[in-house]
């Protein structure tokens, strides 16, 4: 049973997240042969103050 975690900044619409889950599920099924009903996708949304690149939080820019 494949488990996929997608970490991204908050702000996407419910429609975007739904499409993401569907496309990730399809891609995992196509590449691994896993049945769609066995694929689990987690979305973890982060705020800009919990995400940093090159030593700087995105909220500080």
Regions inferred by a protein language model and the residue ranges of each:
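A domain-level signal for the structural core that forms small-molecule/cofactor-binding pockets
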Residues: 2-61
């Amino acid at each position: 049973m494949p488990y996929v975690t997608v970490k991204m900044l908050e702000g996407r619409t419910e429609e975007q997240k739904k499409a993401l889950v569907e496309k990730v599920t399809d891609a995992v099924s196509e590449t691994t042969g896993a049945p769609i009903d066995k694929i689990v996708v987690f979305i973890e949304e982060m705020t800009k103050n919990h995400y940093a690149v090159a030593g700087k939080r995105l909220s500080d820019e």
